[in-house]
Regions:
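Conserved donor-binding/catalytic core segment of Leloir-type glycosyltransferases
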Residues: 270-280, 297-318, 324-327
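Conserved acidic donor-binding segment of nucleotide-sugar-dependent glycosyltransferases
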Residues: 309, 313, 411-412, 416-422, ...
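A charged, aromatic-enriched C-terminal amphipathic alpha-helix characteristic of glycosyltransferases
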Residues: 419, 436-473
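N-terminal subdomain of nucleotide-sugar transferases
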Residues: 2-112, 402
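Helix-loop-beta element that forms the nucleotide-linked donor phosphate-binding surface
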Residues: 221-222, 227-281
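Nucleotide-activated donor-binding/catalytic signature segment of Leloir-type glycosyltransferases, i.e.
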Residues: 329, 334-363
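Membrane-proximal helix-turn-helix segments that form the acceptor-binding/catalytic region
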Residues: 82, 143, 147, 164-167, ...
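Short hydrophobic beta-strand element within catalytic cores of glycosyltransferases
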Residues: 370-373, 389-392, 396-400
Length: 473
């Protein structure tokens, strides 16, 4: 860990320089008043810091879980919050509220959510000004939120995104004698490089920032052993590997629950309706299941189609066209791929792009026949959490290759690894040729997943994170 006190002049200087740069551009636009506003803001910040420097002595069992992103789309941080609550910690969960979090979060009396706004930079002037003003606004907002809340014993922050949250959080933690933990999911600068390229000045600054300020954390968690080695070798940061593990909600779904889910989905998505398109026929039927009201039995539909599932975040680290090319049999963000889907004329394939409630997602995973993962790590050092969830449901996976994928997917054991759309197409043909037979390779992979059991999130968290929190200060 780096001495945070020695870094305070740099943090203060960074804020002041950013303010002066912004002011310079606005002076040129006859906006000298903004320069004065930024200067006054900087003074107020440091007055606030000095005023709130001392804690109230009641922080021993308080933890702030921080993500500068959508809480509802941050499952690992939600799992952290739930685990902390189970062990008696009072949790303040800070992040954007774009998507509804899981019900376990909303119902937990030990978890308080503080919503912050996703700010934007100025939409006029050069791009560097847009970035600078966005960082300044986010810094001020985050600083205010963290200093306003009760003193915490720990702040557990997700990275990425880490700009500006790493610097601001480390400053606040040092002022309030709070221990700072970074959970490294990936490197933020590598995600930026997908858009701007490795040599872009903004990417190079982001890399320096992440490496420099990342060393101020008291503890570090990361998602793979490959990342652990990289952090220590290249950045001098020692981390504990906390693999993503599925919580108990991810499991094979009984056929009755499958039917209930498919009936709900069929009301909105015709792909789940039975062949006659009637959801409310005498025998309740979907494309996959049927319910006999006479004896109450629910069975899978004979000759049912394969339910192939690919969970996607519609981001640049997932090339969804690979799956489309594999299904189409030839090669050449969400709306873009939906246009591609609409342009295809499949004879035996129906494509559905639903948005599921957090409670329905594990039920659908547990009902599927095969998963496809198109996630390619921007750093080559993180693993796709969606595959972890699929394995929790004993769902075999075809996953696209990248450097550390072997830490999760074992080729020809719990799934298959492919490098391009042609390989994926061959794998789909091989795995689904005798569907729904149970003695196929697909059935073999599922049997292996059932036999392996696997560690669940609670056990993994108690083993790797809890000792950090209970260690003497």
């Amino acid at each position: 860990m780096v001495d945070v006190d020695s870094a305070m002049p740099l943090l203060a200087g960074s804020l002041i320089v950013a303010g002066l740069v912004t002011g310079y551009y606005f002076i040129r636009s006859n906006g000298i008043w903004l320069l004065l506003l930024v200067s006054v803001t900087v003074v107020l910040i440091f007055w606030l810091i000095q005023t709130l420097r001392k804690g109230n002595g009641l922080s021993e069992r308080r933890v702030c879980v921080l993500v500068l992103g959508d809480i509802g789309r941050s499952p690992r941080m939600q799992y952290h919050a739930i685990s902390l609550s189970k062990h008696g910690y009072s949790v303040t969960f800070v992040g954007f509220l774009g998507t509804k979090p899981h019900q376990d979060i909303l119902r937990d009396d030990n978890i308080q959510i503080i919503a912050i706004d996703e700010v934007k930079g100025l939409q006029v002037g050069p791009r560097i000004l847009t970035y600078a003003t966005k960082v300044i606004r986010q810094s001020l907002q985050l600083l205010f939120v963290l200093m306003k809340m009760d003193v915490q014993s720990y702040v557990l922050m997700q990275n990425p995104p880490g700009l500006p949250s790493i610097a601001v959080t480390s400053l606040v933690c040092s002022l309030r004698s709070t221990k700072f933990i970074i959970d490294w999911h990936n490197y933020g600068y590598t995600i930026m490089a997908l858009t701007h390229g490795q040599e872009h000045p903004i990417v190079r600054v982001a890399k320096w920032y992440e490496r420099f300020f990342g060393r101020f954390a008291c503890y570090n968690l990361c998602v793979t052993n490959a990342m652990k080695k990289d952090l220590e070798k290249n950045w001098g940061i020692k981390a504990t590997t906390l693999y993503d593990k599925p919580p108990l909600i991810f499991k094979e779904t009984p056929v009755k629950l499958q039917h209930e889910l498919f009936m709900r989905l069929a009301k909105t998505y015709p792909q789940f309706q039975s062949g006659d398109g009637n959801v409310w026929c005498e025998t309740e039927r979907t494309a996959y299941t049927g319910h006999n009201p006479t004896d109450g039995t629910v069975t899978r539909t004979p000759g049912r189609p394969v339910l192939l599932l690919s969970s996607t975040s519609w981001t640049e680290d997932e090339d969804f066209s690979i799956l489309l090319k594999a299904l189409e049999g030839k090669g050449p963000q969400k709306d873009y791929y939906r246009k591609l889907i609409d342009a295809l004329e499949f004879e035996h394939v129906k494509i559905c792009t639903p948005w599921l409630d957090a409670e329905d997602y594990p039920v659908l995973l547990g009902s599927a026949d095969l998963g496809v993962c198109l996630h390619k790590s921007s750093s080559g050092l993180d693993l796709p959490m969606k595959v972890v969830d699929m394995f929790g449901c004993c769902l075999p996976v075809c996953a696209i290759h990248f450097s550390c994928l072997h830490e999760l997917v074992k080729h020809e054991e719990n799934g298959l690894i492919f490098k391009n759309s042609w390989e994926l197409a061959q794998q789909l043909k091989s795995l689904l040729s005798d569907f729904p037979g149970t003695k196929s390779r697909l059935g073999f992979f599922r049997k292996n997943l059932r036999a392996s059991g696997g560690t669940r999130w609670d056990e993994n968290w108690d083993k790797n994170v809890l000792p950090l929190l209970t260690a003497p200060w």
